[in-house]
Amino acid sequence: MANLRDIRKKIGSVKNTQKITHAMKLVSTSKLRKAEEVARNSRAYALKLDAVFDDVLSKMKNQGIEDIQSKYFRELERLEIKKVDIIFITADKGLCGGFNTNTIKKVLACTNEYKEKDIKVRLRGIGKKGNEYFSFNGIEVLDKINNLSSTPNYERAQEFMKKVVEDYLSGKTDKVIIIHNGFKNMITQEIRVKTILPIGYKIIHQNPQPNEVQETITSEPSGSEDEILDSLAEKYVEYSLYYALIDSLAAEHSARMQAMDTATNNAKDLVKTLTISYNKARQEAITTELVEINAGVEALK
């Protein structure tokens, strides 16, 4: 009977866990729909910003301005990279499968790749899980910020990028990249690595689909060429981080929805297995009792 009680308790415990994981799946599904819509709208803005860059650079080229002096731009093919800053984005919470682990693995892989080329690497972290991992393993993270990946905010992203841009413009770093998990569809996330500084022509032109960017830039930019490019570059860099945060959040909800769905299904399977074990143990107990009763009857004859 003690065995039956134990199995019954396990079944009850698993059923409670199943209810929790199912509820978390529903919450993540709801949040994912909202995050997906925000990511879609933000992508449209990002593509528009790329189109503005292309338009301005095209106008400058038509005017015979080939040599861009803006401090944000470099000829990537000729640039000698000695110092790289990696901005990584992870979640503030767990229970999302390999979402955080995959990002951390990519950061470590990129770090090792750069170090093999004698390139100095500095990390800047957004997200509690990533920051905790590197702190626990004794890996220095220059700037740490939590509660931003879970609630993307443009002003906070802008503030975070100020120090990054200052270090780049002062020569403390030669290149800045962002590594994060991106949203591909409801069931798929992919690791994305994007160079945001320096800005090169290959980075600017993202080959948007014709139906994604329908408007063209018709207004003439005012100010000097460098002023125009500096102003656009600041927006480009800031929004690159903000969009990465939005993209990462959508991917996080997608990963958590999948993880909770898997956990719910596993709980269902475990309940079935435990129920079979319970019924088997119950049948054995009944059989044992019947045998004992029959033995007692035979003894009284």
Curated annotation (Swiss-Prot):
Keywords: ATP synthesis, Cell inner membrane, Cell membrane, CF(1), Hydrogen ion transport, Ion transport, Membrane, Transport. One of its GO terms (molecular function) is proton-transporting ATP synthase activity, rotational mechanism. GO terms for cellular component: plasma membrane; proton-transporting ATP synthase complex. InterPro entries: ATP_synth_F1_ATPase_gsu, ATP_synth_F1_gsu. The lineage of its organism: Bacteria, Pseudomonadati, Campylobacterota, Epsilonproteobacteria, Campylobacterales. F-type ATPases have 2 components, CF(1) - the catalytic core - and CF(0) - the membrane proton channel. CF(1) has five subunits: alpha(3), beta(3), gamma(1), delta(1), epsilon(1). CF(0) has three main subunits: a, b and c. It comes from the Bacteria. Produces ATP from ADP in the presence of a proton gradient across the membrane. The gamma chain is believed to be important in regulating ATPase activity and the flow of protons through the CF(0) complex. It is a peripheral membrane protein. Belongs to the ATPase gamma chain family. This is ATP synthase gamma chain. The keyword Nucleotide-binding does not apply. One of its GO terms (biological process) is proton motive force-driven plasma membrane ATP synthesis. It holds the Pfam family ATP-synt. It is found in: Cell inner membrane.
